[in-house]
């Protein structure tokens, strides 16, 4: 597996991966109307519009793009999706590690994530703590977890 920065021509494939992941993986934890609303939102153009305020990576293997992660400039990992056939194989953990390293270099001392019900355990296993359970403020209210992780401890922590 190789991880590198996203290229502009890959946004359509990333948008497809996002939709497929929501429909196949997240569908176990959310009702169909939420999945329909959530998976319909983002296309390649939406990714391009936010390219200036996000850093993005893809995980690749011989099959092509198998995962995607982004963080914004506010010390938040804002999106991560891993192809259903590559779950629990280290893809998400490796993408998260790359994003965390980037955020640390950006000067962040703590990372925030709004996690789905589906991904909550993954983030907990990677050192994130639940701060609050809330509802996503989209058209369809879906439960999410506001989670944080300290990137490094100083001697007074």
Question: What are the residue ranges of the model-derived segments?
Answer:
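Extreme N-terminal starter segment of soluble prokaryotic enzymes
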Residues: 1-3
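Acetyl-CoA-dependent GNAT
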Residues: 5-8, 16-85, 96-98, 102, ...
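Ca2+-coordinating acidic residues in Ca2+-binding motifs
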Residues: 81, 95, 127, 146
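Conserved G/P- and acidic residue-centered "switch" motifs that form tight phosphate/ATP-binding loops
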Residues: 90-92
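C-terminal "cap" of GNAT-fold acetyltransferases
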Residues: 109, 113-120, 126, 132-157
